[in-house]
Amino acid sequence: MFMVNLLTMIVPILLAVAFLTLIERKVLGYMQLRKGPNVVGPYGLLQPMADALKLFIKEPLRPLTSSPSMFIIAPILALTLALTMWIPLPMPHPLINMNLAVLFMLAMSSLAVYSILWSGWASNSKYALIGAMRAVAQTISYEVTLAIILLSVLLLSGSFSLSTLITTQEHTWLMLSSWPLAMMWFISTLAETNRAPFDLTEGESELVSGFNVEYAGGPFALFFMAEYANIIMMNTLTAILFTGAFHNPLMPELYTINLIIKALLLTVFFLWIRASYPRFRYDQLMHLLWKNFLPLTLALCMWHVAMPITMAGIPPQT
């Protein structure tokens, strides 16, 4: 039975990934005053299927000087970890209800760094290695602020379980009360998922395509799917953390629809940012984090720790 549950979670995620590629191309197309894909199927709806078919029937080429086992393991690991991170997300019921769901997600996103590092190293190409090293430095750096922001949110929620956040936000969204945290979280998720304007790892003008430059066909498709699954997962997590969806225990389906709509709007916002902003310079990217976000998030975290202790002696003012 558990396998059936697992499949009912994985298949919709992969379908969402397929159609996100189409939405991205359509949104970018309309923002550049053109149509986007509109040939395969009605309004280009079958384009993702055609893309998947094209990628998976291509011969998976492998550079002669590459490290074969690691070269193959990296994309598989990337997709596996991207799908594993969906397990504790409440929709409104998670696949496995963990006590330390947030910690589990942080650990999984840290492990995803290894797949990037291995792919860059195993390709035995200078471009891939430089792209991988950039991606690893960027991902590890921005995880620091993500963890501190999560800690601040959990201090407000009072539990490491994500399901508690539904109850916490019954009266008001955390996005309204903790908007600086929400803002920094959103920008950090952009950097964490290597999206524009932080897509330094795949700077086409410098690194061709970044750490996956030597990949073709199936393995490349796995990396691609992992990246987009991470984008949808991060936006769903943002929706859970900061814009708590309305949850009526008698109608759990309403919560799911609400959550999906919010995650979709956030994802379209990701694409809007991609269409609007130029790429950051690498040193600016690191300065933004270490000199702006980190001091701010640490100060806010200490504020959230100190306030309940400071206010504990004051009687209720109602």
From Swiss-Prot:
It is a multi-pass membrane protein. InterPro entries: NADH_UbQ_OxRdtase_su1/FPO, NADH_UbQ_OxRdtase_su1_CS. It comes from the Eukaryota. Its EC number is 7.1.1.2. The chain crosses the membrane at residues 3-23, 70-90, 100-120, 146-166, 171-191, 222-242, 253-273, 294-314. Its main location: mitochondrion. One of its GO terms (cellular component) is mitochondrial inner membrane. Pfam families: NADHdh. It catalyses: a ubiquinone + NADH + 5 H(+)(in) = a ubiquinol + NAD(+) + 4 H(+)(out). It is found in: Mitochondrion inner membrane. GO terms for biological process: aerobic respiration. Keywords: Electron transport, Membrane, Mitochondrion, Mitochondrion inner membrane, NAD, Respiratory chain, Translocase, Transmembrane, Transmembrane helix, Transport, Ubiquinone. GO terms for molecular function: NADH dehydrogenase (ubiquinone) activity. Core subunit of the mitochondrial membrane respiratory chain NADH dehydrogenase (Complex I) that is believed to belong to the minimal assembly required for catalysis. Complex I functions in the transfer of electrons from NADH to the respiratory chain. The immediate electron acceptor for the enzyme is believed to be ubiquinone. HAMAP family: NDH1_NuoH (MF_01350). PANTHER family: NADH DEHYDROGENASE SUBUNIT 1 (PTHR11432), NADH-UBIQUINONE OXIDOREDUCTASE CHAIN 1 (PTHR11432:SF3). Belongs to the complex I subunit 1 family. This is NADH-ubiquinone oxidoreductase chain 1. The gene is MT-ND1.
